[in-house]
A protein has these predicted regions:
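Gram-negative (and chloroplast) outer-membrane scaffold detector with strong preference
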Residues: 87-176
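Cleavable N-terminal export/targeting peptides
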Residues: 1-45, 228
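Short loop/turn motifs that connect adjacent beta-strands in outer-membrane beta-barrel proteins
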Residues: 40-51, 86-87, 139-152, 188-191
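Residues that define the transmembrane beta-barrel architecture of outer-membrane proteins
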Residues: 50, 70-76, 123-129, 150, ...
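Short glycine/proline- and aromatic-enriched beta-strand/turn motifs that initiate or cap beta-hairpins
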Residues: 24-82
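Residues on the lipid-exposed face of transmembrane beta-strands in outer-membrane beta-barrel proteins
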Residues: 56-60, 76-82, 94, 131-137, ...
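Membrane-spanning beta-strand positions in outer-membrane beta-barrel proteins
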Residues: 53, 89, 151-153, 179, ...
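Predominantly the C-terminal beta-signal and adjacent terminal strand-loop region
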Residues: 90-94, 101-113, 117-119, 124, ...
Length: 228
């Protein structure tokens, strides 16, 4: 339960910035009709080949278990996004690289006791292949504007998470995972966006050779997205 509360609390803090932006974005000109009202639709849906983007990012993974014992690993994020309307889109992605968690017991992922913590550090690699449903709240509330500087995009994700041993450790596990996230798109040019993505992941505690329970991870990445 502590993991779930931590997960929800972290996302709530990330979401504060999301709700401070729409009022400002709505004041921008260029997305208003002849009466000065913000245009929020309806929109013509685009063709399959329109409004795609590819992105790559790097950052950190913060894994935790029910006791708030956390450890940091490196994160790599690669994704492809398709916007169906200005406010609704889908994304397929790979997230992963390295992870670590503290455990009270020795497992296949960690057998050396850390005397300062009286715990065993579990080190592993992981790959999370996921599908996301995106909602651009800036366009949904403030109306579509191509030149908007900052877009706030909450999303839900689900997918397959594979964990494997590092440094010769013999371990592999596959689990269902899901969660919520907040994507910030900052416009650099017509074709290029700076991205800041905060993602919470929930999965089974077995993923790091622990028996049962719920495990969580908070992933934060900074990267670039190219609009095709």
């Amino acid at each position: 339960m502590k993991t779930v509360k931590f997960f929800l609390g972290a996302l709530a803090l990330a979401a504060v910035s999301m709700f401070t932006a729409p009022a400002v974005n709505a004041q921008e000109d260029g997305n208003r009709d002849e009466n000065g009202k913000v245009v929020r639709g309806p929109y013509l849906t685009n063709q399959f080949g329109d409004n795609w983007a590819v992105g790559v990012a790097g950052g950190i993974n913060l894994f935790m278990d029910g006791g708030f014992k956390t450890a940091v690993g490196g994160a790599l994020d690669v994704n492809v996004t398709k916007w169906v309307t200005p406010a609704v889109g889908g994304r397929l992605g790979y997230s992963g690289l390295t992870g670590a968690e503290w455990s009270d017991a020795s497992t296949a992922l960690g057998t050396v006791l850390d005397d300062s913590k009286n715990m065993f550090k579990q080190k592993f690699g992981f790959a999370y292949v996921h599908a996301d449903v995106l909602w651009n709240i800036s366009h949904a509330i403030g109306g579509y504007k191509e030149t908007r500087l900052w877009n706030f995009i909450p999303y839900a994700h689900t997918g397959w998470l594979r964990t494997y041993g590092r440094a010769g450790a013999e371990f592999a596990d596959n689990e269902f995972a899901m969660g919520l996230g907040l994507l910030n798109n900052i416009r650099l040019s017509k074709r290029l966006d700076l991205t800041l993505d905060v993602r919470g992941i929930l999965t089974n505690g077995r993923h790091h050779a622990y028996v049962g329970g719920v495990a969580g991870a908070l992933q934060t990445t900074l990267g670039l997205s190219v609009n095709l």
